[in-house]
């Protein structure tokens, strides 16, 4: 599809990737660093994450062939319809997809992320951006949940700093800087 559109002159693309491109759906997953960067490598073991990673790689391949195209790959968080947002997560056992359960955005914000990406000025290149809320979907500090899941396997010091206790597990600074997107429906607003 990309090649077809490129051959017909389309210059701008916004593609739906997933925060699962890093491979978090496997219980053996441990991030390289926290918060998880936009360009975190794929450490997938189950097949789902690598399918998203391959899509991102195909977009890079297409760009190498046509360096005048603008591609934004949004690594989208778990998305819930606005009137069916789950309760905030507490400490619980690590299961498949656990990280997705604390990285939630409502549908209105997800649509806004895509809209703002489409409306963002044309900029040739390939960009990968975490499209998640700025806060984790938790009722307790993130470090407590991650320590319960991963023990001392991962450096949690970022979440132990004052003011970062409830921050998203994913770094959202690039999407904020480049397209101005910040999810509006955060746990504090939704749960009050």
Where are these regions (language model features)?
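Active-site Tyr-X1-5-Lys
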Residues: 3, 43-71
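Hydrophobic positions on the long internal alpha-helix
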Residues: 1-5, 58-59, 113, 117
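Mid/C-terminal beta-alpha module of Rossmann-like enzyme folds, strongest
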Residues: 113-172
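Amphipathic terminal alpha-helices
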Residues: 165-166, 173-178, 182-192
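Short-chain dehydrogenase/reductase
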Residues: 33-40, 44-56, 100-108
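Alpha-helical substrate-binding/gating segment
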Residues: 79-95, 100-128
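Conserved SDR Rossmann-fold cofactor-binding beta-strand/turn motif
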Residues: 17-18, 73-78
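Conserved Rossmann-fold NAD(P)-dependent oxidoreductase catalytic core, especially the SDR/UDP-sugar
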Residues: 1-45
């Amino acid at each position: 599809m990309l090649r077809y559109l490129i051959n017909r002159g389309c210059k701008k693309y916004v593609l739906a990737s997933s925060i699962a491109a890093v491979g978090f759906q496997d219980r053996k997953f441990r991030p390289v660093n926290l918060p998880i960067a936009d360009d975190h490598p794929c450490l997938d073991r189950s097949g789902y994450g690598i399918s998203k990673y391959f899509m991102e790689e195909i977009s890079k391949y297409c760009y190498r062939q046509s360096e005048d195209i603008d591609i934004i790959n949004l690594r989208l968080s778990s998305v819930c319809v606005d009137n069916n947002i789950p309760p905030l997560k507490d400490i619980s056992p690590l299961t498949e997809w656990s990280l997705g359960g604390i990285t939630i955005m409502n549908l209105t914000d997800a649509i806004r992320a895509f809209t703002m990406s489409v409306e963002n000025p044309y900029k040739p290149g390939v960009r990968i951006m975490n499209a998640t809320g700025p806060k984790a979907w938790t009722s307790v500090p993130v470090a407590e949940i991650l320590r319960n899941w991963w023990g001392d396997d991962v450096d949690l010091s970022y979440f132990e700093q004052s003011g970062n206790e409830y921050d998203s597990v994913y770094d959202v600074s690039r999407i904020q800087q480049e397209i101005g997107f910040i999810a509006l429906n955060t746990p504090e607003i939704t749960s009050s």
